[in-house]
Amino acid sequence: MVKNSVISVIFQKEKKGSVEFQVFNFTNKIRRLTSHLELHKKDYLSQRGLKKILGKRQRLLAYLAKKNRVRYKELINQLDIRETKTR
């Protein structure tokens, strides 16, 4: 599973404040909230929380893409998320 391999790599580095670790945590929260919202379609507070977390992850990914493009590409491939649109 992708989750276990990413966890082992991140915990080996012991950088819990790193951008990669934060994006990883946000991705897990997003996946949990998405599965919750599939069951509870009218849970508007959870929808709002999901949008906030998506925005935070998007900002962190934009920061990482600007600072280190190679780490950004590796991270989005490991987490199996789409690349952000550039303007």
Swiss-Prot record:
GO terms for biological process: translation. Its main location: plastid. GO terms for molecular function: structural constituent of ribosome. The keyword Ribosomal protein applies. Gene3D superfamilies: S15/NS1, RNA-binding (1.10.287.10). CDD domains: Ribosomal_S15p_S13e. Transmembrane segments: none annotated. Part of the 30S ribosomal subunit. HAMAP family: Ribosomal_uS15_B. This is Small ribosomal subunit protein uS15c. It comes from Solanum tuberosum. The gene is rps15.
